[in-house]
Amino acid sequence: MKLNTLAPAAGSKSAPKRLGRGIGSGLGKTSGKGHKGQKARSGGYHKVGFEGGQMPLQRRLPKFGFTSASKRYVAEIRLHELNNVVADEVTLDTLKDFGLIRKDIKTVKVIASGEIQKAVSLKGIACTKGAKEAIEKAGGKVE
């Protein structure tokens, strides 16, 4: 088998519809658009969500909620993920280097999920009460 001999299975691909190519094709003259009307014209169709002048659904339903723009740059990291960091001092940059958080993250919080097996020193990183206790119990410290 060679890449240049690969072909789809017989009957798995259908030929594209050739519109407006004579009455024998079955899609001649009006090309499957019927007679007249807005939808038969070139470029003619209503915009998405238009309901013929009736108040559209997305305007009938109430607005709600709010998404903080700064929330995009905040991340949570679990306690057991700190085991993957091969460094004694854990900062925002070391977490980025080891691929635990995205490059655009500005604030991180360590949460108590899982167990930590080694002593690490957190610098400039927030953590929950439970996570702080677990880190200090493992011989690490939070600064």
Swiss-Prot record:
Residues 1-52 are annotated as: Disordered. Keywords: Ribonucleoprotein, Ribosomal protein, RNA-binding, rRNA-binding. GO terms for cellular component: cytosolic large ribosomal subunit. Residues 21-31 have a biased composition (Gly residues). SUPFAM superfamilies: Ribosomal proteins L15p and L18e (SSF52080). Coiled coil: none annotated. The keyword rRNA-binding applies. Gene3D superfamilies: 3.100.10.10. One of its GO terms (molecular function) is rRNA binding. InterPro entries: Ribosomal_uL15, Ribosomal_uL15/eL18, Ribosomal_uL15/eL18_sf, Ribosomal_uL15_bac-type, Ribosomal_uL15_CS. It comes from the Bacteria. GO terms for biological process: translation. HAMAP family: Ribosomal_uL15. Binds to the 23S rRNA. Belongs to the universal ribosomal protein uL15 family. Part of the 50S ribosomal subunit. This is Large ribosomal subunit protein uL15. The lineage of its organism: Bacteria, Pseudomonadati, Pseudomonadota, Gammaproteobacteria, Thiotrichales.
